[in-house]
Swiss-Prot record:
Keyword Transport: no
Pfam family, one: EF_TS
Domain of life: Bacteria
PROSITE patterns to which the protein is assigned, alphabetical: EF_TS_1 (PS01126), EF_TS_2 (PS01127)
Subcellular location(s) of the protein: Cytoplasm
Role of this protein: Associates with the EF-Tu.GDP complex and induces the exchange of GDP to GTP. It remains bound to the aminoacyl-tRNA.EF-Tu.GTP complex up to the GTP hydrolysis stage on the ribosome.
Region (Involved in Mg(2+) ion dislocation from EF-Tu): 79-82
Keywords, comma-separated and alphabetical: Cytoplasm, Elongation factor, Protein biosynthesis
Name listed for the protein in its UniProt record: Elongation factor Ts
NCBIfam families: tsf
């Protein structure tokens, strides 16, 4: 069968692979476009395997929501350039929507979820790797499924937040989600802060005090320490922080004024916890030249 330009074009549009790759696939499969597409998919899987050990620390946080059900997914790429590629962005949206419509509890479970096309998330990932030429990883999935007030917020594709409120409205929930994105509080309220953390901070504050302060009566010393600890606890709790949309009040005051309560939240930031590889090209050249 003759391999025409229109056949190559059709395969390119269908698979996103390069022109020469599509032509080769059609030649290898006697012009059968379905077999050629499958051949390219298998080639994509091979490329994915070769790239699997490369660090993917850039990427995007994507979200999907339907009522009180919402998800955040983190999908990583190797470079910020690919993180802005339309194929990558489309893939992250596919992953988020697939997560929303599945029962997958984490990223590992999500890999085997089937799309409407019949392929799995893992198979689609491999196909996108073939298009963009970088290692991609579906790294994290978090979800909230509740009858309460739920908001999903993503800032610049880099930080995502899910927050659940009992009471309040959509505007308040979104505002609280924006605050969490900006301020990254580890805990909701003071009672959530581990006792070990408080004890350690007390120890540190006491060590920092002057001998003159340490010589003060026990009850005064306790008041000084308690004041410092209270300030620290406010800094690490959502409720204790000044509300970014109205710094005249704390988040707790804003929430209680609306007759609401924050039940919990999830926050993801692209690449957090991943050690990025810092290339030292000078050292690499020296090593290859036997000078290091």
């Amino acid at each position: 069968m003759e391999i025409t330009a229109s056949l190559v074009k059709e395969l390119r549009e269908r698979t996103g692979a390069g022109m020469m790759e599509c032509k080769k696939a059609l030649v290898e499969n006697a012009g059968d476009i379905d077999a050629a597409a499958e051949w390219l998919r298998k080639s994509g899987l091979a490329k994915a395997d070769k790239k699997a050990d490369r660090v993917a620390a850039e990427g995007r946080i994507a979200t999907a929501q339907a009522g009180g059900k919402a998800v955040l997914v983190e999908v990583n790429s190797e470079t910020d350039f690919v993180a802005k590629d339309e194929n990558f962005l489309a893939f992250t949206d596919v992953v988020a929507n697939a997560a929303l419509n599945s029962d997958a509890a984490d990223a590992d479970a999500l890999k085997s979820v089937k799309l409407d096309s019949g392929e799995t998330i893992e198979e689609r990932r491999a196909a996108v790797i073939a298009k963009v030429g970088e290692n991609l990883q579906v790294r994290r999935l978090v979800r909230i499924d509740s009858a309460n007030n739920v908001a999903a917020y993503v800032h610049g594709g880099r930080i995502g937040v899910l927050v659940e409120l009992k009471g309040g409205d959509a505007e308040l929930a979104r505002g609280i989600a924006m605050h969490i994105a900006a301020m990254n509080p580890p805990h909701v309220k003071a009672s959530d802060v581990p006792a070990e953390f408080v004890a350690k901070e007390k120890e540190i504050e006491l060590a920092k005090m002057s001998e003159k302060d340490k010589a003060k009566p026990a009850e005064i010393l306790e008041k000084i320490i308690s004041g410092k600890i209270s300030k620290i606890v406010n800094e690490v709790t959502l409720y204790g922080q000044p509300y970014v949309l109205n710094t005249d009040q704390t988040v707790e005051q804003a929430v209680k004024a609306a007759g609401a309560e924050v039940i919990g939240f999830q926050r993801l930031a692209v690449g957090e916890g991943i050690e990025k590889v810092v290339e030292d090209y000078a050292a690499e050249v020296m090593k290859q030249a036997g000078l290091a």
